[in-house]
């Protein structure tokens, strides 16, 4: 959520900054907010005046009664005054609801470093690590490898649940679990994160706090009749752990690493990378979430990207980093980097992690603040998160990049201690 004061003081600047954001967003609502805010402030001034008058007259009534004067007309006037105040209060509540409705649907303002552009083709590559894997034979796609090695069962996943669900079997299940353990160990013992195991269901306030609601409700799995949502990412429960709290500045930054299953309907994605493990309705992920002071947030973002990179480097998987352009930035981020792993079956890099600085956008929605000392006025914190990284896509990348001509798959050195085998065959 944006700062209403900033909108009030600089509406034209806000409209300009949001005009090429790439969201389905009409900047004209900024003018509506300014108009409503001005009306509300005028009403509040008037109400204060009326309440002052009512208090003054109310204090005089006992004196007039004691003096034997008739106060009938004065009492009638006070009742009318009370009705007037009540009507004003009703209008203020209506304005508040409308402003909140609009504010919850306004995307974040891009950082000046965000490149111009409309689609993912306009994202800017800033780094490459490793070289795309070369083969002396025709490599298989991970869905074929998984089927041939009897470690991924897409057919039975579809039978049990439907399209875009997968059953992991034998060494496939162990590979998934080994990667999870490796990521969590790396982030907690080397990168300084505290491990969190969060709930997989959250309430509407939590989904609103991190920005999934109201805009992306159609992409969420909702549990009917009780208001719960299955989490699309551990970012939601971990960020909302601190909702409506004022944190002490001396404990910042807070760094959490959370493994969870993630659930996404991904409406409108039919036909886009839906074969194999790349785009599933249910998948596992290790999420990195940070809470820090505003002046530290961009340095923390750089470190967050490095932490996400570290697990891919440990696995020896080639990747690149792109800075996301304005049109592809999404709703909540002020600045975002995608890490894309090389996927031979696609002959291109595929997103495996997004690392974002939301600045105070989520903190305003979730009301998360901090203060340096107990005497200081609380200020909104900055939140960041990044995939550290998506597990299913890592499984796919390992299978494809480490496959051998005989159809076996070598296990990366970093996870052999978890796998207890050198090859899947």
UniProtKB/Swiss-Prot annotation:
Q: Where does ATP bind?
A: 264-266, 351-354
What CDD domains is this protein classified in?
A: SerRS_core
User: Quaternary state and partners of this protein?
Assistant: Homodimer. The tRNA molecule binds across the dimer.
Q: Which SUPFAM superfamilies match?
A: Class II aaRS and biotin synthetases, tRNA-binding arm
Q: Where does this polypeptide localize?
A: Cytoplasm
Tell me the organism: Clostridium botulinum (strain Alaska E43 / Type E3)
Q: What class of enzyme is it?
A: ligase
- Chief place of localization: cytoplasm
Q: Which UniProt keywords apply?
A: Aminoacyl-tRNA synthetase, ATP-binding, Cytoplasm, Ligase, Nucleotide-binding, Protein biosynthesis
Which comment does the entry carry about domains?
A: Consists of two distinct domains, a catalytic core and a N-terminal extension that is involved in tRNA binding.
- InterPro entries reported for this sequence: aa-tRNA-synt_IIb, aa-tRNA-synth_II, aa-tRNA-synth_II/BPL/LPL, Ser-tRNA-ligase_type_1, Ser-tRNA-synth_1_N, SerRS_1_N_sf, SerRS_core, tRNA-bd_arm
Q: Which family does it belong to?
A: Belongs to the class-II aminoacyl-tRNA synthetase family. Type-1 seryl-tRNA synthetase subfamily.
**Which domain of life, per UniProt?**
Bacteria
* UniProt: L-serine binding residues: 233-235, 287, 387
A single BP term in Gene Ontology: seryl-tRNA aminoacylation
Bilayer-crossing residues are: none
Catalytic reactions of this protein: tRNA(Ser) + L-serine + ATP = L-seryl-tRNA(Ser) + AMP + diphosphate + H(+); tRNA(Sec) + L-serine + ATP = L-seryl-tRNA(Sec) + AMP + diphosphate + H(+)
Report the EC number(s), separated by commas if there are several. 6.1.1.11
- What is this protein's record name? Serine--tRNA ligase
A cellular component term from Gene Ontology for this protein is: cytoplasm
The metabolic or biological pathway listed in the UniProt record of this protein is: Aminoacyl-tRNA biosynthesis; selenocysteinyl-tRNA(Sec) biosynthesis; L-seryl-tRNA(Sec) from L-serine and tRNA(Sec): step 1/1
Q: One matching Pfam family, short form?
A: Seryl_tRNA_N
Q: What GO molecular function annotation could you give as one example from this UniProt entry?
A: transferase activity
Purpose: Catalyzes the attachment of serine to tRNA(Ser). Is also able to aminoacylate tRNA(Sec) with serine, to form the misacylated tRNA L-seryl-tRNA(Sec), which will be further converted into selenocysteinyl-tRNA(Sec).
